[in-house]
Design a protein with these regions (language model features):
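Feature captures hydrophobic
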Residues: 1-123
């Protein structure tokens, strides 16, 4: 794993992936942090299970989608995105397909995108 350096703006230098563009400054807004975590928990309640892990780095992660339980190591189905992307999906401002096409959502595993069946969470 590459080592990351935190820059003056709070962003991790050399980081890759959807969350790396966001930086740690997002924690300066407690409303954003609360919204992201609340909506992640809401996702886990609406589609309970352990088959897919939805990650919003620096904010939280939940396991959801019924199916085979995952107990150790990296789950076979993982989705990762920034806080802004997660909020846009949860609020119905964009689709999973849009976020994937624009590289703001990373997904691995054959069932990774099954979490999208309950989106948007807020109607």
């Amino acid at each position: 794993m590459d080592q990351l350096r935190i820059g003056a703006g709070g962003a991790a230098a050399g980081a890759t992936g959807p969350a790396s563009r966001e930086g740690a400054n997002a924690f300066a807004n407690p409303t954003l942090t609360t919204a992201v975590r609340f909506l992640l928990e809401d996702l886990a309640v609406r589609i309970p299970g352990n088959s897919v892990e939805v990650r919003v780095p620096l904010f939280g992660a939940v396991q959801c989608v019924p199916g085979p339980d995952h107990r150790r190591g990296t789950p076979p189905n993982v989705v990762e995105m920034s806080a802004q992307t997660w909020l846009a999906l949860a609020l119905g401002e964009e689709t999973v397909e849009q976020a994937l096409a624009e590289g703001r959502l990373l997904a691995s595993g054959t069932r990774a995108l099954e979490f999208a069946a309950v989106l948007p969470l807020v109607r």
